[in-house]
Amino acid sequence: MPKANPTRKTKATRETGGRKKKDPNAPKRGLSAYMFFANDNRDKVREENPGISFGQVGKMLGEKWKSLSDKERKPYEDKAAADKKRYEDEKAAYKAGEAEEDEESS
């Protein structure tokens, strides 16, 4: 028996913008431990492998990340935890400010 086709968005749905526009004032999400690692090591990987494609850089960073010990990952995980807290604090302040604006406009 063939699989049922998943429902597809019609052209009309895409044109009307099924997704909400992101508020430019909203806080940026916190980075993961891997993203902190990748940001710190991306230039080094490019220097060691000149002419490497963007995709290959990502693969090499992923392999390096997987080979790190827990002790080597710890500083990046600490940065990620701090960034997550920053995001949650900024998000709470943003939501509180948004709620105040709603009350004032009512």
Curated annotation (Swiss-Prot):
Cellular compartment(s): Nucleus; Chromosome
Residue segments, region Disordered: 1-33, 60-106
SUPFAM superfamilies: HMG-box (SSF47095)
Biased composition (Basic and acidic residues): 12-26, 61-93
Listed Gene3D superfamilies: High mobility group box domain
Biased composition (Basic residues): 1-11
DNA-binding region(s), residue ranges: 27-95
One GO CC term, this protein: chromosome
GO biological process, one term: DNA repair
Name of a matching Pfam family: HMG_box
The protein's assembly and partners: Weakly associates with the stable spt16-pob3 heterodimer to form the FACT complex.
Family in the record: Belongs to the NHP6 family.
Protein name from the UniProt record: Non-histone chromosomal protein 6
Gene name, Swiss-Prot/TrEMBL: nhp6
